[in-house]
Protein backbone atom coordinates (compact mmCIF):
# COMPACT_ATOMS: atom_id res chain seq x y z
CA UNK A 1 0.00 0.00 0.00
CA UNK A 2 1.48 3.35 -1.03
CA UNK A 3 2.22 5.98 1.56
CA UNK A 4 -0.29 8.90 1.52
CA UNK A 5 1.06 12.12 0.06
CA UNK A 6 -0.10 14.15 3.07
CA UNK A 7 -1.20 13.77 6.66
CA UNK A 8 -3.19 16.01 8.99
CA UNK A 9 -1.96 15.89 12.56
CA UNK A 10 -2.65 17.99 15.63
CA UNK A 11 0.23 20.03 17.02
CA UNK A 12 0.74 22.98 19.35
CA UNK A 13 3.03 25.93 18.77
CA UNK A 14 4.10 28.90 20.86
CA UNK A 15 3.31 32.20 19.12
CA UNK A 16 3.96 35.74 20.26
CA UNK A 17 0.87 37.94 20.59
CA UNK A 18 1.09 41.60 19.58
CA UNK A 19 -1.52 43.64 21.47
CA UNK A 20 -2.59 46.75 19.54
CA UNK A 21 -3.89 49.44 21.89
CA UNK A 22 -4.07 52.38 19.47
CA UNK A 23 -5.38 52.95 15.94
CA UNK A 24 -2.54 55.42 15.30
CA UNK A 25 -0.24 53.23 13.21
CA UNK A 26 2.57 55.79 13.30
CA UNK A 27 2.60 55.66 17.10
CA UNK A 28 2.33 51.86 17.09
CA UNK A 29 5.25 51.49 14.67
CA UNK A 30 7.43 53.98 16.52
CA UNK A 31 7.03 52.00 19.73
CA UNK A 32 7.51 48.69 17.94
CA UNK A 33 10.69 49.92 16.23
CA UNK A 34 12.07 50.85 19.63
CA UNK A 35 11.46 47.33 20.93
CA UNK A 36 12.85 45.71 17.77
CA UNK A 37 16.05 47.71 18.13
CA UNK A 38 16.63 46.15 21.55
CA UNK A 39 16.34 42.53 20.36
CA UNK A 40 16.21 42.38 16.53
CA UNK A 41 17.19 38.72 16.13
CA UNK A 42 14.54 37.55 18.57
CA UNK A 43 11.74 39.02 16.47
CA UNK A 44 13.19 38.54 12.97
CA UNK A 45 10.74 36.54 10.85
CA UNK A 46 8.62 35.84 13.91
CA UNK A 47 5.01 34.73 13.31
CA UNK A 48 2.60 36.90 15.28
CA UNK A 49 -1.01 36.78 16.36
CA UNK A 50 -2.40 40.32 16.57
CA UNK A 51 -4.80 40.99 19.44
CA UNK A 52 -7.31 43.71 18.51
CA UNK A 53 -9.55 43.51 21.58
CA UNK A 54 -8.69 47.13 22.47
CA UNK A 55 -9.83 48.36 19.03
CA UNK A 56 -13.60 48.79 19.04
CA UNK A 57 -14.12 50.86 15.88
CA UNK A 58 -14.30 49.26 12.45
CA UNK A 59 -12.25 51.76 10.43
CA UNK A 60 -8.95 50.46 11.80
CA UNK A 61 -6.41 50.04 8.97
CA UNK A 62 -5.70 46.32 9.29
CA UNK A 63 -4.19 46.09 5.80
CA UNK A 64 -1.83 48.95 6.65
CA UNK A 65 -0.76 47.23 9.87
CA UNK A 66 -0.06 44.00 8.00
CA UNK A 67 2.11 45.78 5.42
CA UNK A 68 4.03 47.71 8.07
CA UNK A 69 4.80 44.53 10.00
CA UNK A 70 5.88 42.73 6.83
CA UNK A 71 8.25 45.61 6.06
CA UNK A 72 9.93 44.82 9.39
CA UNK A 73 10.12 41.08 8.58
CA UNK A 74 7.33 40.21 11.01
CA UNK A 75 4.52 37.97 9.80
CA UNK A 76 0.89 38.13 10.94
CA UNK A 77 -0.56 34.62 10.89
CA UNK A 78 -3.88 35.56 12.46
CA UNK A 79 -5.86 37.93 14.66
CA UNK A 80 -7.83 37.54 17.86
CA UNK A 81 -10.28 39.69 19.81
CA UNK A 82 -11.44 41.62 16.73
CA UNK A 83 -14.89 42.99 15.94
CA UNK A 84 -17.05 41.16 13.40
CA UNK A 85 -16.20 43.69 10.68
CA UNK A 86 -12.45 43.53 11.32
CA UNK A 87 -12.60 39.73 11.46
CA UNK A 88 -14.13 39.72 7.97
CA UNK A 89 -11.39 42.06 6.76
CA UNK A 90 -8.81 39.72 8.23
CA UNK A 91 -10.26 36.77 6.33
CA UNK A 92 -10.18 38.81 3.11
CA UNK A 93 -6.48 39.45 3.81
CA UNK A 94 -5.84 35.73 4.20
CA UNK A 95 -5.44 35.86 7.98
CA UNK A 96 -6.74 33.25 10.39
CA UNK A 97 -9.16 34.05 13.21
CA UNK A 98 -7.50 32.66 16.31
CA UNK A 99 -9.49 31.75 19.40
CA UNK A 100 -7.71 31.48 22.74
CA UNK A 101 -7.37 27.86 23.77
CA UNK A 102 -8.14 26.46 27.20
CA UNK A 103 -5.27 26.02 29.62
CA UNK A 104 -4.19 22.41 29.91
CA UNK A 105 -4.47 20.91 33.39
CA UNK A 106 -1.83 18.30 32.59
CA UNK A 107 1.64 19.50 33.58
CA UNK A 108 4.39 19.05 30.98
CA UNK A 109 6.92 16.28 31.55
CA UNK A 110 9.90 17.22 33.69
CA UNK A 111 13.12 17.98 31.81
CA UNK A 112 15.12 14.81 31.28
CA UNK A 113 18.62 16.21 31.70
CA UNK A 114 20.63 19.19 32.88
CA UNK A 115 23.34 20.97 30.93
CA UNK A 116 26.06 22.58 33.07
CA UNK A 117 28.38 25.28 31.72
CA UNK A 118 31.32 26.42 33.88
CA UNK A 119 32.41 29.55 32.05
CA UNK A 120 31.23 32.98 30.98
CA UNK A 121 29.05 33.21 27.85
CA UNK A 122 30.37 36.03 25.71
CA UNK A 123 28.77 38.30 23.09
CA UNK A 124 27.78 36.38 19.96
CA UNK A 125 27.78 32.99 21.71
CA UNK A 126 24.67 30.85 22.15
CA UNK A 127 24.10 27.92 24.51
CA UNK A 128 21.04 25.67 24.18
CA UNK A 129 19.91 22.96 26.61
CA UNK A 130 17.56 20.72 24.64
CA UNK A 131 14.99 18.77 26.67
CA UNK A 132 16.41 20.00 29.95
CA UNK A 133 17.57 22.69 32.33
CA UNK A 134 20.60 24.93 31.86
CA UNK A 135 22.93 25.84 34.73
CA UNK A 136 25.66 28.41 34.13
CA UNK A 137 28.46 29.08 36.61
CA UNK A 138 29.46 32.41 35.15
CA UNK A 139 28.08 35.52 33.52
CA UNK A 140 26.01 35.88 30.34
CA UNK A 141 27.35 38.94 28.54
CA UNK A 142 25.60 41.52 26.39
CA UNK A 143 24.80 40.02 22.98
CA UNK A 144 24.96 36.42 24.26
CA UNK A 145 21.99 34.03 24.25
CA UNK A 146 21.15 31.17 26.60
CA UNK A 147 18.19 28.94 25.76
CA UNK A 148 16.65 25.93 27.49
CA UNK A 149 13.57 23.79 27.05
CA UNK A 150 13.49 23.72 30.86
CA UNK A 151 14.66 26.29 33.40
CA UNK A 152 17.77 28.49 33.37
CA UNK A 153 19.92 29.07 36.47
CA UNK A 154 22.73 31.63 36.20
CA UNK A 155 25.24 31.90 39.04
CA UNK A 156 26.44 35.27 37.86
CA UNK A 157 25.16 38.29 35.95
CA UNK A 158 22.59 37.94 33.16
CA UNK A 159 23.21 40.81 30.74
CA UNK A 160 22.29 39.10 27.45
CA UNK A 161 19.17 37.16 26.45
CA UNK A 162 17.68 34.20 28.33
CA UNK A 163 14.86 32.08 26.89
CA UNK A 164 13.49 29.33 29.14
CA UNK A 165 10.65 26.93 28.36
CA UNK A 166 11.64 27.19 24.70
CA UNK A 167 9.56 24.12 23.83
CA UNK A 168 6.48 25.62 25.50
CA UNK A 169 6.91 24.62 29.17
CA UNK A 170 5.05 27.30 31.22
CA UNK A 171 6.53 26.01 34.51
CA UNK A 172 10.08 26.95 33.53
CA UNK A 173 11.86 29.72 35.45
CA UNK A 174 14.88 31.98 34.99
CA UNK A 175 17.03 32.56 38.08
CA UNK A 176 20.06 34.86 38.11
CA UNK A 177 22.30 36.43 40.74
CA UNK A 178 22.09 39.70 38.82
CA UNK A 179 19.20 40.50 36.45
CA UNK A 180 20.41 43.02 33.88
CA UNK A 181 19.05 41.21 30.82
CA UNK A 182 18.44 42.54 27.32
CA UNK A 183 15.55 40.09 26.99
CA UNK A 184 13.99 37.30 29.04
CA UNK A 185 11.39 34.86 27.72
CA UNK A 186 9.44 31.95 29.17
CA UNK A 187 7.30 29.80 26.86
CA UNK A 188 7.12 32.64 24.34
CA UNK A 189 6.13 35.38 26.81
CA UNK A 190 8.92 37.95 26.93
CA UNK A 191 10.18 41.09 28.61
CA UNK A 192 12.70 43.52 27.20
CA UNK A 193 15.17 45.40 29.41
CA UNK A 194 12.73 48.25 30.03
CA UNK A 195 10.01 45.85 31.23
CA UNK A 196 12.43 44.14 33.60
CA UNK A 197 13.50 47.47 35.07
CA UNK A 198 9.86 48.43 35.65
CA UNK A 199 9.09 45.23 37.55
CA UNK A 200 12.26 44.72 39.58
CA UNK A 201 14.49 46.97 41.66
CA UNK A 202 16.59 44.11 43.03
CA UNK A 203 19.57 42.58 41.30
CA UNK A 204 18.91 38.91 42.04
CA UNK A 205 15.60 37.29 41.20
CA UNK A 206 13.45 34.53 39.78
CA UNK A 207 11.36 35.17 36.68
CA UNK A 208 8.36 32.93 36.07
CA UNK A 209 4.94 32.91 34.44
CA UNK A 210 1.88 33.98 36.39
CA UNK A 211 -0.97 32.97 34.10
CA UNK A 212 -0.03 34.50 30.75
CA UNK A 213 2.21 37.25 32.15
CA UNK A 214 5.75 37.25 33.45
CA UNK A 215 6.56 38.18 37.03
CA UNK A 216 9.80 38.51 38.99
CA UNK A 217 10.39 37.50 42.60
CA UNK A 218 13.29 38.74 44.71
CA UNK A 219 15.69 36.11 45.99
CA UNK A 220 18.10 36.33 48.95
CA UNK A 221 21.15 35.39 46.89
UniProtKB/Swiss-Prot annotation:
- State the SUPFAM superfamilies in the record: Cell-division inhibitor MinC, C-terminal domain
Gene3D superfamilies for the chain: 2.160.20.70, 3.30.70.260
Q: Which UniProt keywords apply?
A: Cell cycle, Cell division, Septation
Q: Name one GO biological process term.
A: cell morphogenesis
Question: Pfam families under this entry?
Answer: MinC_C, MinC_N
Q: How does it assemble?
A: Interacts with MinD and FtsZ.
Protein name in the entry:
Probable septum site-determining protein MinC
Q: What would be the name of the gene that encodes this protein?
A: minC
Amino acid sequence: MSKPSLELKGASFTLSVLHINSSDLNAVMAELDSKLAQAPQFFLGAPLVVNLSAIQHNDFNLHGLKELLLSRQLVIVGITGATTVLSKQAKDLGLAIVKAGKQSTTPPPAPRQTKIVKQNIRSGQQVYAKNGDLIIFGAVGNGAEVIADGSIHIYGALRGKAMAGAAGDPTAVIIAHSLEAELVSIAGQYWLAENLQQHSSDKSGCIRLNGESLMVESLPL
